Structure formats: structure tokens, C-alpha cells
Amino acid sequence: MRLTSHVARFLAGSLGLAFALSSLAGTDAYQTIPSVSPQPEQTSVGPQDPAELAAFIDGVMTAQMRAQQAVGGMVVIVKDGAILLAKGYGDADRENGRAVDPYTTLFRPGSVGKLFTWTALMQLVEQGKVSLDADVNTYLTQLSVPDTYPGQPVTVRNLMTHSAGFEDGSVGYLILDSDARLLDPVEALIRYTPQRVHAPAGGDFNNGDMASYSNWGTELAGLIIANVSGLSYNDYIEQNIFQPLGMASSTFRQPVPDRLKERLASGYNNKGGRLKPQPYEFVMFPAAGSLSATGEDIAKFMIAHAQNGAYQGNRILSDAGARLMHGRALSPNPHLNGAALGFYENHVNGRRLLVHAGNTTQFQTEFNLLIDEGVGLFFSVNSESIFSFSARKELLNAFMDRYYPATLPAVQPPDDFAERAADYAGSYRFNRHSYSTIEKAFSMLSSGISVTPTPHNTLRISGVGGPLAKEWVEVAPDTFRRVDDDPMIAFSRDEQGQVAYLLNIGSLPSMQAYRIPSAENPQLHWLLWAAASLGFVVAVISLLRNWGRDKRQGGLARLARISAGLMGVLQLSFLVLFGLSIVALTNQPLGPYPELLTWGLTLSLIAIGFTVLSAGFVPVAWYQRWWSGYERCQYSLIVVLAVAFLWSLHTWNLMGYKLP
């Protein structure tokens, strides 16, 4: 919405002091460590010649598209308030021979759309209708965020920095293959309300503060926008961001309006070793990622933020509001990238970027803004599960190395690091996962992030791709730099002073991990499942082999063997159905949880009764000397394994129907 000049002047004057005071309440600024931080070349002026820039980007993209088998992609670069480069690569629709055109082709940039939600929310902050530090429940009438941590409400600022402490979830409902399964925004928020598993992060990351990315939290922000403005989320975005910027080829509506359908790119997945077009993705939480837009439209949005809210005579934010939004709002460590209000910080070659990534099951996107240089780089491909994380970063790194080079000081490990290296060793798990639903079980499919000391007095981090899978050297207490590049990570400690958390994985402040408790070690549980499965098989075989003899003996001894055998059949059936469900979810990522899973959970619940019954027979079997001593030991061990298996199911939320 365009502001008249006198209203703009009034807001700038009246809000300037408030924004300045708010900024003082923020976290410390990014602090370099001069001896190990990149030293930018001060004479660098960035890209100047569009033709030279196009030739360079062509070389990088051609190699990347070929290496990563991407079907189509686009790159848009802006500088000094104008598009310097906008190029398409490959196909938007390979089956019909339609090439990617950044001026006409709509891509689905996923979570990059969150930046529009945060910008809209910032507009309401400017208007005095929303306070950054107010309890979000102040603006909600249809639902409320639980008061899990009394005296520590979730604030608007927490939503914008992903520091509210919500658990995460997505499988079976976040991205759908049909609008028939879409729910009304309020209904969706209520049905999929996550638990608050951490207190809101306030900056004390050495005492357990954790930031964790939340799609649900962003959709909640979309509801606040609608409630406060009196408009639907879509109407507000269209009237107050799209129209002032002239973004006529962008929409959050699902499916896209008829006027845009013919220009929408197809998304591709790797199915059986071949890239195949996939159905349109419907997003349950539109404010978190249902955007469809051309590269040209994204360029207009980038330019507006690069110019602190201004675009061709219009404004989407005041200068003061934009500066507040772009400033550091949360930081886990002064030497690490922090979070702005909606954006993330990144530092490459000693320069600060405001960034956001976007992933759907079909599209991968990077939004990068060198805010001090007035330069933006947008990159997107329509081939998910192909374009790797490291490949996506290579374009930005190549661009920065060419146009904003820096000298990276060599770094030497401290001589005494070996004395404390063991403090960091262990396995860590991303804190962005479900804690209360069956989705937690998917954490068992990964061994987590492994941190191992090396003979070189460094740490080797493995178990995750991209820039993390390298060696890291200590440059400050609990703070590490990659040996061959400038990314930084850090560890934080619990109240007992023990290393408990790994911060800024992939240079993102919302990507944090905690040390995996011994009771949740995936290897332990897989070993237990294997042993229990063997026990279940033995129980079934024992029942069948001794059926005739037990029938002649009759009585409780026979009932004990039947109980254990049925327990084995039921739990083995559960394991088979659970495995088939995982395969089904892998092959149909947009579908709901398969009914096979519900059947399996039902069989496992029935098995609990037989497990309890079998456990009750153990002391009786020993007291009355049923069977041989070997058979009694075997029976007892099977029951112990069965009980341990139930504990494992409980640990991973597989006991009962804990579906989202």
C-alpha cells in the first residue's frame, strides 16, 4: 500500500525513536575474530558489465545443471535498484518443450515466501497495530498458544526469529497432492498445533536456549496479519506488497489463478533413476510457503529490501522499519550468523548477507541479499532431490569469490586443544523434529551428526552433507571455523557446564542440534529391534514346533507358549507394515500416512496384552519347572526383549495412534 507523503513523514518521525530504542534491545552485533576472519578486498565494486556477468553465470550454471541433472532453473541478480541479470536455464516443462523464462515463468520458491509474511507483519508493526514483544495471543481470537512456560509467552519477535520453541512436523499434511485435503487456515492451525518443547529463546544459549525453524509459527503470523488488518492473508499481501511493487505475476493462492496457470513451471522428482514431472503441490500453511512467482517479480522484492523498503517511488516499509527488520535480532553466539526479523544472516568473504532458502518436494531456492552493497542474487531450480545442498551454495560462493573476493587467513589449532577435544565428541540430532507424534520415529532413521576429534587437533563433523562435513578448528572458546573456508559453528553448554548443543549448522541460526541422549541412540534401538525380531521369530517357531506336545500337556504351560507366539506374530506383522509404510511415504511424499501404518499400530497395541500375559507366566514357569531349563531361559529372554521393544516403541511415539 502506497503511503501519502505526509503520512510517510509522520511515521518516519514518530517511529524513528521507537525503532532506535527497539534496536538497542537487540542482541550484540556480529563480532569478527580478526586473526581468522576473511579480509575483504576493499577495492571490490561487484559486478559491473551485464555481458561479462552473464558469461560467468552461464559457465557456472551450465556445469551445475549438467552435474546435478536439474531440468530447469533461473538466476536473477539485482544491483543499484535494477535487474543486472535475469536468465533461465533448461526447461520449465520438458514434456512440452517450454523453456524457463525468468520474466514469464512462475517457480515455487517455497519458504522464500515467508519473507513476504514477515514484511507484511513488519508493516503492521510500523503502523502501531502489532508490537514485536507482545504475546501473540494478544492478536488471536480463534485459538491460543499454550502457556507451557508460565511467564515466558511466545512473542511476535519469537515468531520472526523462529525462536518460539515449537516442535516441527510435516509428514502427511504440510505438502499435499490435492486441494481436497487442504483445511481452512484456522482449522489447520488448530489441528496441527505443535507442542512447545523449548522456552522462547532470549539469547542465553549456554543455558539451553534453542531456536528451531517453524512452518506452523509462520502460518500463525499469517493469521495475525489477517486478524489485525481485517483482510484475508492473500488480500493483504496482494494489496500491500504485490501491488506497490508491481508484482503482477505472483500469488500465494492455491491453485494459481487461471491467468497464471499456463506459465507455471512443472516440478520434477527423481523416480526410479529418472526425473519425472509431479503434480502441483498444495501447501497446508500458505503463509509459510505457497508462493508462486517469476524471477522478475522476486527481483522487485529484492530491490525494495535492498533500498530499505523503497521501489520506484513506492514504499513497502519505511527506512527505519526496514533497517530494524534487517538488523540482528537474535544470535546464539557473537561470532556466528544470527537472525534478523524474518531474514537470516550469512557472512561470505567477510561481507554480510540477508538470506533465506526455500524447499518443496520439487523446487529448491536461494534468496541472497548483500544489504550493504545493494546487490541481490536469487536462484531456483525445479528439480528437488537432485540439486544438492552443496551445489546450491556453489553458485553463491563462485559469485562472491569473483566479485567480492577476500583473503582467508590460515588458522592453526591451539596446541592444547587435544586436552578438551573429547568434550565435544559424540552424536547430535537436529532439534527441528517432532517430539510428540509418530514423526519422531523418523529420527531413528538417521544416526545424527557425528563429532569426532582428529589427530590434527581439529574436529571432524560427519553425518550431514554440505559445508558441515569438513574439519573444524577452534578459534575461540567453544567456537570453530572450517579449516578451508569461512563458515563458523559453535557449541554451547548446559547448566552443569557440559557441552550439550551444536549451533548454526549450515551457518543458519535456526539449525541447531542437541547431544543425543543415550536412551535415544539410534544404533541401540536398531540393535534392540533386531534382537527382538529374532526373539519374536523364535517364539513363533517354538509355538509351532511344540504345538502337539503342549496340546497333550494342556494347562497354563500351553497357554504361555500360545501367548508368546501370538505376541511374536503381532509384532512381526507390525514391523513389516511399518517398513512398508516407510516405503510408501518415500514413494508418495505428498500423500497421507498409509492405512498400513494404522493397521500395524493396532496390531502392536494388541501385542501389548500378550506381552503382559507372557511376562506374568515367566515366574510361574520357573516355579513350576515347565519345559527344560533351556526352554525356560529362552522364554524369559524373549519376554525381556519384548518388553524392551515396547520401551523402544514408546520412545519413538510408535505406541498408540500418535499421528498428527
Label each PLM-derived region with a short phrase.
Residues 2-11:
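Bacterial N-terminal signal peptides that target proteins for export
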Residues 20-23:
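N-terminal signal peptide c-region/cleavage motif recognized by signal peptidases
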Residues 25, 29-31:
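Boundary at the C-terminal end of the N-terminal hydrophobic targeting segment
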Residues 45-107, 129-131, 146-148, 194-204, ...:
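Short, conserved catalytic-motif segment at the N-terminal edge
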Residues 66-74, 96-158, 202-217, 286-289:
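Short active-site loop at a secondary-structure junction
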Residues 87-93, 148-371, 399:
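Short, surface-exposed loop or secondary-structure junction motifs
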Residues 355-356, 366-370, 374-383, 500-505:
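Short, well-ordered beta-strand elements
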Residues 390-660:
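Peripheral terminal and inter-domain segments
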